[in-house]
Amino acid sequence: MKNVSEIINQGNKNAELPAWLNMRHAWSASDAKRDEGLIYPNNVIQIKNLDYKKEPDHQKWCEAVELLASQRTMGEKTSEKYSRIFYYNEPDDASNLDSERYASNSLFDIYYPAEPDAQTSYPVIVSVHGGGWFYGDKELYSYYCCHLASKGFAVVNFNYRLAPQNKYPAAIEDVAYLIRYIHENAGVLHLDMEKFYMLGD
């Protein structure tokens, strides 16, 4: 287990950037090393980059599920790691640590067991990514969430607004927005909200 100073020291410091942004880059470098060589389970389908602050497009959602159930692929990533993935929306520059969108987007992913059943509602796990409310995004936990989904759960993995661009309690509010969204759309998303779990670090 590395301590914070070790992680910061291994990052590429830029004197022109504020300390908190350098820390974001340092944590990102550490997490990238952690995830090297991971092999994703092949019995999971992923629907990525929905937006929990926008009304859902039910037709597009049904098309995504049908596409994945037929084991076809859509999107640019077609390696075995991403063979059952559907990009509901493109993320723009949401993965750029220096961008405003990285700190202020409301995208989320859902992971399902590989053989979705239109008549089944799955027990649901919501994953709140770590990072002290100022760093991190859903991609950091994609492998972990896929592993949970491979055990028979629907797993929701999401972004929330980060500090310091967004003042407290913005991140907490986004957790509430996400939960309300999946509750209101549980039927379409095949989620059993009577079997609802949350986790995070």
Which residues does each PLM region occupy?
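Gly/Ser-rich "nucleophile elbow"/oxyanion-hole loop immediately N-terminal to the catalytic nucleophile
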Residues: 120, 183-199
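N-terminal cap/lid segment of alpha/beta-hydrolase-fold proteins
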Residues: 21-120
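Residues at the C-terminal ends
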Residues: 8-27, 75, 79, 150, ...
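Alpha/beta-hydrolase active-site loop
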Residues: 166-188
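Short beta-to-alpha linker loops that shape the active-site pocket of alpha/beta-hydrolase fold enzymes
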Residues: 114, 131, 154, 159-163
